[in-house]
């Protein structure tokens, strides 16, 4: 729902009051013409009352409490408080006083609820009087035209657009007089060259107060007015030859652009395009500004150290240090690699070292401006000369997450209020300043790509890369809803979500998310059993421990060789597990934590990626997909999302759709999860549609393993005891069929596995 500013509310109120006063004046102006009729009617009624004659069949007229005449004009105008036929003088006078008292009380009640104070004498305007005298009323001029808002924003480095909240003829005339005008009939948006910006604002200023113009910030215009920076490829000659020779053409372009921006840049290429190589190349070019600080996730510290020693052989090994619990001495290290947690804990030591070049890997970790880790990073960047931020997903769900990262590159661009008001639809709410929205995203995209951010997708720079396809697999409901208690629990969560508001919704959804993981375990394991038979290497991503433990136990029971990496896996064991999956053909499955392993590892040996659970952010899922779909992948990759209907999956999938639309407008998310092919998991039960559309099912009797067997409440016509025995027999038979499916380990496919 759109909101109005206080100035817009005041303007609309003023216009409404003016129109009301004008209407009132018009009615009062016509009062003399009808005054004679009212007087005649009143006199006749008085004489009739004095004679004591009244017609019992004639209904008594009641005094109206408004100024409006009869639509037909044929009915006589009755004085507001004058005597009516059949009434005597005293009763007429008492009725008039009663009407005045009732109207006065109504006016007081209405005035108390009004958000603004009425003008002086405002309470008197609708009170009934004993006459229609217009001596106190003065005509008010009627305002012509409507008040609208016109928002101006950039759509490219040399053009801007104008979007209006309504139609205004004079404003359209101003648009048509601009030399570089262009009108889009589909979106109904005007666009112009930046050379017409000042002229348009000057002419639109004459239309106040009917047109309120929201202009482009001066800082944005100044940024567009700067001469373009032309990268020079000659700078590549100053980079370590071993590293420069391994850079692909698009990576060389990225290095040149970063150097042209004086080493303060966000490299946000899509996952798997070698951001690490580009960052090290830029750091090597500015090696005179070292010492170098690399902040990354805890699981990728050793990987960074390995890359530095391999790609920059001129850096002595003893000058490269990894900051961990065992190595807390910073000393004279030329290159220090630390996790974000260790950076926060040892802020003072790092500040004393005065690093001149800083690399923040997975920089979206710093999205929260109030987090201690972010404030530490901001202090370090303030004293550093060069800052490079690396992230394939710089914002996970909303534009606000970009602010802190932009501040680390250019702290003078915009402050918090300016940025959130312009690009986050910032406004004051009951709970404070609300900056979780989005606005002017096209302009934000232009600014990011103009100076601050470098982003390329795999489709753009690696058209020869193996294809990636997505599929959503609907799990067998008979394996999800295994008892009546499960169905009641899920139904209860769905009902709570429909009535909950605010933070209560988030809490319920989190519990719903955890419960969904529990009920999906059997169905997920059943699907994995069919997948193992294909003898292809695949990755399984899960989040909750209950899901990971269930899959781990299931694979162990099938005697499948697999690796498991989660948040508790040590970094040295982590790298060994990755090597095992990549190099050993007998290792078929990699069971990974969705949070701990969505970045920083390469598993191109996998052909299939399975998501046993969803995540709140589309960027997290895209990062996880890129563990296999990246440089070095030679086979097509299939990403399968296992969905259970009527669970939290339905809600989260819709949330992912909305978030990816916002991120796509900013130009930092190129994937489309909604284009996934929909399939159904193999099931021995009846058609899957009957579980979700029972009204259209043509089956009269429940089939084997049908979910209806467990929740049927229609009693049969047989005796109660016999009915109970029959139902128990059906349930036991269904459960035995499911158990037989899981315990069927004598398949020929398993005998051929290379274990």
From Swiss-Prot:
Where is the stretch described as Disordered?
Answer: 26-91, 104-134
**Which InterPro entries does the UniProt record give?**
HARP_dom, Helicase_ATP-bd, Helicase_C-like, P-loop_NTPase, SNF2-like_sf, SNF2/RAD54-like_C, SNF2_N
What EC number(s) are associated with this protein in UniProt? 3.6.4.-
Q: Which domain of life is it from?
A: Eukaryota
| Ranges in coiled-coil conformation | 7-27
Q: Name one GO biological process term.
A: regulation of transcription by RNA polymerase II
GO CC field = nuclear replication fork; nucleus; polytene chromosome interband
Q: Where is the protein found, in the record's own terms? A: Nucleus
Give residue spans, biased composition: Polar residues.
Answer: 32-63
The Helicase C-terminal domain covers 527-681
* Residues covered by the Helicase ATP-binding domain: 256-412
Domain HARP: from-to ranges:
139-217
Q: Which family does it belong to?
A: Belongs to the SNF2/RAD54 helicase family. SMARCAL1 subfamily.
The name this protein goes by in its record: SWI/SNF-related matrix-associated actin-dependent regulator of chromatin subfamily A-like protein 1
């Amino acid at each position: 729902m759109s909101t109005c500013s206080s100035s817009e509310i005041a303007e609309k109120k003023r216009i409404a009051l003016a129109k009301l006063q004008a209407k009132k004046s018009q009615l009062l102006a016509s009062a003399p013409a009808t005054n004679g009729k009212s007087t005649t009617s009143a006199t006749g009624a008085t004489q009739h009352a004095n004679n004591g004659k009244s017609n019992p069949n004639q209904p008594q007229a009641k005094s109206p409490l408004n100024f409006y005449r009869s639509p037909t004009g044929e009915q006589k105008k009755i004085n507001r408080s004058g005597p009516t036929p059949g009434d005597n003088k005293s009763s007429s006078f008492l009725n008039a006083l009663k009407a005045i008292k009732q109207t006065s009380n109504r006016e007081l009640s209405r005035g108390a609820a009004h958000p603004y104070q009425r003008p002086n004498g405002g309470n008197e305007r609708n009170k009934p009087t004993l006459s229609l005298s217009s001596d106190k009323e003065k005509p008010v001029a009627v305002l012509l035209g409507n008040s609208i808002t016109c928002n101006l924003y950039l759509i490219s480095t040399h053009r801007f657009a104008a979007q209006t909240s309504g139609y205004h003829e004079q404003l359209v005339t101003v648009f048509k007089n601009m030399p570089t005008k262009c009108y889009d009939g589909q979106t109904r948006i005007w666009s112009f060259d930046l050379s017409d910006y000042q002229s348009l604002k000057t002419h639109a200023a004459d239309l106040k107060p009917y047109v309120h113009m929201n202009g482009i910030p001066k800082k944005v215009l100044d940024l567009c007015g700067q001469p373009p920076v032309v990268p020079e490829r000659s700078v590549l000659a100053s980079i370590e030859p071993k590293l420069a020779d391994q850079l692909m053409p698009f990576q060389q372009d990225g290095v040149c652009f970063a150097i042209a921006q004086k080493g303060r840049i966000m490299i946000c290429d899509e996952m798997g395009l070698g951001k690490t190589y580009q960052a090290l190349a830029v750091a090597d070019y500015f090696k005179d500004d070292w010492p170098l600080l690399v902040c990354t996730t805890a699981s990728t510290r050793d990987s960074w150290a390995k890359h530095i020693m391999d790609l920059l052989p001129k850096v002595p090994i003893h000058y490269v240090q990894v900051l961990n619990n065992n190595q807390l001495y910073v000393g004279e290290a030329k290159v220090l690699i630390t996790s974000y947690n260790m950076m926060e804990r040892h802020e003072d030591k790092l500040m004393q070292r005065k690093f001149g070049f800083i690399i923040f890997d997975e920089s979206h970790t710093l999205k929260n401006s109030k987090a201690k880790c972010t404030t530490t990073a901001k202090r370090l960047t303030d004293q550093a000369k060069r800052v490079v931020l690396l992230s394939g997903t710089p914002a996970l769900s909303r534009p606000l997450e970009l602010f802190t990262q932009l501040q680390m590159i250019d702290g003078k661009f915009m402050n918090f209020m300016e940025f959130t008001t312009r690009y986050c639809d910032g406004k004051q709410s009951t709970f404070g300043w609300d900056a979780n929205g989005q606005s002017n995203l096209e302009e934000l995209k232009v600014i990011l790509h103009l100076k601050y951010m470098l982003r390329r997708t795999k489709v753009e720079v690696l058209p020869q890369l193996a294809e990636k396809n997505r599929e959503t697999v609907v799990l067998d409901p008979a394996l999800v809803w295994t008892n009546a208690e499960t169905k009641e629990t899920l139904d209860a969560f769905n009902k709570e979500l429909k009535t909950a508001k605010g933070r209560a919704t988030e809490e319920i959804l989190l519990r719903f998310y955890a419960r969904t993981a529990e009920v999906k375990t059997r169905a997920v394991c059943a699907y994995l059993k069919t997948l193992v038979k294909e003898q292809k290497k695949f990755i399984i991503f899960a989040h909750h421990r209950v899901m990971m433990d269930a899959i781990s136990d299931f694979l162990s029971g099938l005697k499948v060789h697999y690796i498991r990496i989660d948040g508790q896996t040590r970094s040295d064991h982590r790298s060994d597990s990755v090597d095992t999956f990549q190099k050993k053909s007998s290792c078929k499955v990699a069971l990974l934590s969705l949070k701990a392993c969505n970045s920083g590892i390469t598993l191109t040996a996998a052909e299939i990626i399975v998501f046993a659970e969803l995540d709140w952010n589309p960027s997290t899922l895209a990062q996880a997909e890129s563990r296999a779909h990246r440089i070095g992948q030679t086979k097509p990759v299939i990403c399968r999302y296992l969905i259970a209907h009527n669970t939290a999956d339905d809600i989260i999938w819709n949330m992912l759709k909305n978030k990816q639309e916002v991120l796509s407008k900013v130009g930092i998310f190129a994937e489309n999860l909604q284009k996934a092919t929909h399939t159904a998991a193999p099931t021995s039960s009846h058609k899957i549609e009957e579980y979700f559309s029972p009204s259209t099912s043509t089956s009269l009797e429940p089939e084997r393993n049908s979910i209806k067997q467990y929740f049927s409440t229609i009693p049969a016509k047989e005796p109660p005891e016999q009915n109970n025995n029959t139902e128990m027999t059906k349930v036991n038979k269904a459960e035995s069929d499911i158990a037989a499916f899981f315990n069927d380990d004598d398949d020929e496919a398993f005998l051929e596995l290379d274990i």
